[in-house]
């Protein structure tokens, strides 16, 4: 399989495992962006926990699913977003205003759109989950 995006492969395998009713999924290869994205998902309760396994190659991540994840995906290319444009993207990508999160990479790190709005920083959109 051709890996166009490691983050895209990660999120699609998690979404497929969730639809099949699996309790855990193994993701390889690993990257820092995937770990930060999973940390944001865990903070909001969409995944139970995850563990990084170092296999002296590219690494693996074992993610424990809790059945709350409906859909997740990557936005490619990574569009630039100002603080004022975040509201428009949430309307495009998420089913409701109170439901789901857009993950941004900013100068202050990888965070969800609500935290970016509070810190008044823009950035590039990585993906979404709800």
UniProtKB/Swiss-Prot annotation:
<keyword id="KW-0687">Ribonucleoprotein</keyword>
<dbReference type="GO" id="GO:0003735">
    <property type="term" value="F:structural constituent of ribosome"/>
</dbReference>
<dbReference type="InterPro" id="IPR000630">
    <property type="entry name" value="Ribosomal_uS8"/>
</dbReference>
<keyword id="KW-0689">Ribosomal protein</keyword>
<dbReference type="GO" id="GO:0005840">
    <property type="term" value="C:ribosome"/>
</dbReference>
<dbReference type="Pfam" id="PF00410">
    <property type="entry name" value="Ribosomal_S8"/>
</dbReference>
<dbReference type="InterPro" id="IPR035987">
    <property type="entry name" value="Ribosomal_uS8_sf"/>
</dbReference>
<dbReference type="GO" id="GO:1990904">
    <property type="term" value="C:ribonucleoprotein complex"/>
</dbReference>
<dbReference type="InterPro" id="IPR047863">
    <property type="entry name" value="Ribosomal_uS8_CS"/>
</dbReference>
<comment type="similarity">
    <text>Belongs to the universal ribosomal protein uS8 family.</text>
</comment>
<protein>
    <recommendedName>
        <fullName>Small ribosomal subunit protein uS8y</fullName>
    </recommendedName>
</protein>
<dbReference type="GO" id="GO:0006412">
    <property type="term" value="P:translation"/>
</dbReference>
């Amino acid at each position: 399989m051709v890996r166009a995006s490691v983050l895209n492969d990660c999120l699609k395998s998690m979404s497929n495992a969730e639809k099949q009713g699996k309790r855990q999924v193994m993701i390889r290869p690993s990257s820092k962006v995937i770990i930060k994205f999973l940390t944001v998902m865990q903070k909001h309760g969409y995944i139970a926990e995850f563990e990084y396994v170092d296999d002296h190659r590219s690494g693996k991540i074992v993610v424990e699913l809790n059945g709350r994840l409906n859909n997740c995906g990557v936005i490619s290319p990574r569009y630039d977003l100002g603080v004022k444009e975040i509201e428009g993207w949430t309307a495009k990508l998420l089913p409701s205003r109170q439901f789901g999160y857009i993950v941004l990479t900013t100068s202050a790190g990888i965070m969800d759109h609500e935290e970016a709005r509070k810190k008044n920083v823009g950035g590039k959109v990585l993906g979404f989950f709800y």
